[in-house]
Structures are given as C-alpha cells and as structure tokens.
Amino acid sequence: MRHLFILVLFSSFLFSCTSQDVKVDAKKSQSHYNLGLELAQLNLFKNAVEEFDLAIQFNPEDPKIHRKKGILLFGMKNYEEARDSFQKTIELDPEDAQAHINLGMIHYTSGNKDEALKSWEYAIGLKPDDNDSKALNNIGNIYKSKNDLSKSIEYYQKAIAYEPSNSTYLNTLGDSYRLKGDLVKAEEILLNSLKVDTNGMLTHFNLGVLYQTEGKFKKAVDSFQKSLNINPYYTEAYYQLATSLLKTNNKESAKQSLEKAIQADPNNLKFQELYNKVLAS
C-alpha cells in the first residue's frame, strides 16, 4: 500500500505537464493503466481515474483504457463522463461489443430504455458466437417492463442458452412465464433456479407471488419467509407475506409483518393502508 501511495505521488509530480507536452508512449501508458487497475482494486477510485487519464495522455488511441475508465466512472455514478468514455471507446473500436453494452447501461440507468435497447441489440449482432448473455438478459428485462412477455421470454432463453446454470436468468424467465399465465412452466423454472442457488432471494419471492396467484397461500407464506430469511430488508416481501397471512386468517402475524415493513419504509402508503385495514378489521 505504501508502495502504491509513493507511485501515485510520483506520477502526479512527474506528469503534471499538459497533454500538449506528452508524446505517445505505449509503455508509459500501460504502466499508468496497470497502476489504475491496482488502485481500483483497493477502492481508490479517484486515484485510479487519474491514472487512467495519464494512460490516455500517453496513448489516447487505446480503446481499452477509455472503456475501463468508463466502467469506473459508472461505478462512481458519474454517468455523463462514463457515457463520454464509452462513446470514445466505440469511436476508436466500433466493434467493441462490451462498450456498446456498457453504453446501453448508461442509457438504461438514465431512463432511456429505447436507446439502451438499441445499444444492446447492436452489441449482440457484432459477434454472434460470443457469450452475450448479459446483454440478452438486459434486453429481456426491457421487453418484460414493456409487458411484451413473448419477446422477454425469447431473450431470456437466449441468455440461458449461454449460461444454463445462471439462477438470475432462470428467475427472470420463470417470472415472465408467471406473468404470461403459464404457472406450471413458471414453477418448474423457478424451482430449477433454486436448485442452482438455494439462497436466491428473488426466486423465493417470485415463487411466493406464483403461489399467491394459484391460491396456495400457505406455500406462499413459506416462500416469502424464506426470502426474508435471506434478505430481511426486502420490504415488499413483508407486504406480500402479510397479504398471504391474511388469506390464512393469521391476522396477528400479518400485523407484525406489516409493522416490520413500515419500520423499514415509514413513508410507504401501500404498507400503511393495509396496516390500517388490519387494525380496523
């Protein structure tokens, strides 16, 4: 750590000159790039960005440096600069699929789902044989949010073809089948997801919602409780648990579940309304 600190001070002193004074030097660029990676691993993100900037000064045409810098800036929630870095990467290497995927994440985070969809669909078309499962899953998520369930299922299945044991992909696929009304298929896939990851919090939650839909409220209660055992801060699970408990005439437990939800999220009107109904009943 002391060695890294000295290197940071040294590089800041030695390379404080303007970019106009710097000539292309691939070796020096790589040295700063490597130091930036080390600093990022130590969570010294600001210092890491500075090293990536120095790496870019010495070799401004290297797309991987711009992409790495963009990823770091995205993690720091500096979305505008991250977008600029990914766009520069694409300018230097139009076939950098990961840069297109990352740019899509910027659009998605900014609420521009249509632009995100364009970026991701373009990315998966660049190299058909590459594992584009993340982009495919992201596309599925957008179609799911648009309630185009046939499309969402199509893309989730494509993602799973690359990673058949990815519990996240299985979970989203199963929930799409639930929303489409194919409850048997949904349960089969969600249970398979739990075989891959028994601690899949959202999978247990989605199973609970599935069992609610089927009117199997005791099984729903069990699933929501398992979800909360894994993540006791997932407030929606408390709410859904309470609704299922009420269906089994367990008013006191439902009240306690809602109290936990309200304690975690006191401004949630939905939680408060159901709680008031329970008290009044």
Tell me the role of every PLM-derived stretch:
Residues 34, 68, 75, 102, ...:
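Canonical tetratricopeptide repeat
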Residues 29-30, 63-64, 97-98, 130-134, ...:
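Helix-start (N-cap) detector for alpha-helical repeat units in TPR-like alpha-solenoids
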